[in-house]
Amino acid sequence: MTATKTIEVALSTSGLGPDGRPIRIPLGAEGLTGAPPGLEPELEGEHMLINIGPQHPATHGVLRLVLELDGETVVRCIPHVGYLHCGFEKIGEYRQYNQIIPWTDREDYLNSMGNNVAFVLGAERLFGVEITERCRVLRVIAMELSRIISHLVWLGTTCIDIGAFTPFLWCFQERENVYKLLEGWTGARLTTSGTRVGGMIADVPDGWTDGLRAFLRGFPKTLDQVDAMLTRNAIWVGRTVGLGVMTPDEALNYGLSGPMLRASGVAYDVRKDFPYLGYETYDFDVPVGTNGDVYDRFLVRFEELRQSVRILEQALARLPDGPVNIDDPRLILPPKHKATSEMESMIHHFKLVMEGPRPPIGETYVPIESPKGEKGYYFVSDGTAKPVRWRIRPPSYVNLSAIPRMVEGHLLSDVIAINASIDIVMGEIDR
């Protein structure tokens, strides 16, 4: 990297220069030459430096890993992120609460409904409202379907990375079945924007639950097929056992969560330890590993797929009748037929859309158990319709921070499997 590139410049928002253009401020100190500290390591002896990414199929996004190698052994790893930065948190400060929901789709786009639910849980705590029982159960269904989607994509793409093709096809076929269910409910497959503060975008249509039951009858058979092909497969075991080991203490010290933490033997699950949406009333197990390696992360996520099926079956059995949205004119729009026929409802609709609901002054943090770990949203309200601060706690970002420790001492070919086992989405990391 040249000094010219290192001493890059940024556009300042502080003012304009004499020529009417934004003032440029150097990012580096005056006189700085070469790469900033830690960007490119000083090589020792005959060590070699290589890049994986930011454009590489096995990084599953614009992630760059700078690796220092001694032969084929990784001596050091420096992850580079930020290529996909969009400024979600800053944008949220200029949007009403319901207007922020579409941005949550685009963080971890494999868990869009889960992000939607997590966001409105935090907003509803800020507003001090209680949702209906039907909405509560539907949100559990939405979150577990998103967990299944995310784990299926992880499993299928990890199989591709390691060299197994058939399970990839099985996983993506089942993923397509779930997307059809979400599309029938929200009208969208990937970026659903399915929730609203105080409820959902819509109730499930007639016959939708029958489709979910049909999926739950067939999905376990696919899991059995994948289990038979992978779990005791000598090649799969040889490519995953003993790689990227994290002890329980290391996992906790790095702040890992989700399957990454549970694979190391720590039974922490937000659904059990800090229940929300009535998860404490559902009968399901939290799978825990013992070795903290790539193989245990596979086992934990695979078993979580079966546990999600259990939760969904229980949710369907207890899904009550009744409204999906709360009856609160501060938050919920009037019915469409009233908004187009009654002047009062039309005015109510206009003011709520244009001005937005206003929570009381305060702050709150709400975590959920996303497919990748503890996903949290922090809000600060000054009593206006837009949050003063909206902070995202992205599990992918925290989990990725441990990759230098996990790949150290392993072969270059093992880096791909270790990176895949973290299960990252760059939209969530860079935000």
Description of each model-found segment:
Residues 2-431:
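Metal/cofactor-centered catalytic core regions of large enzymes
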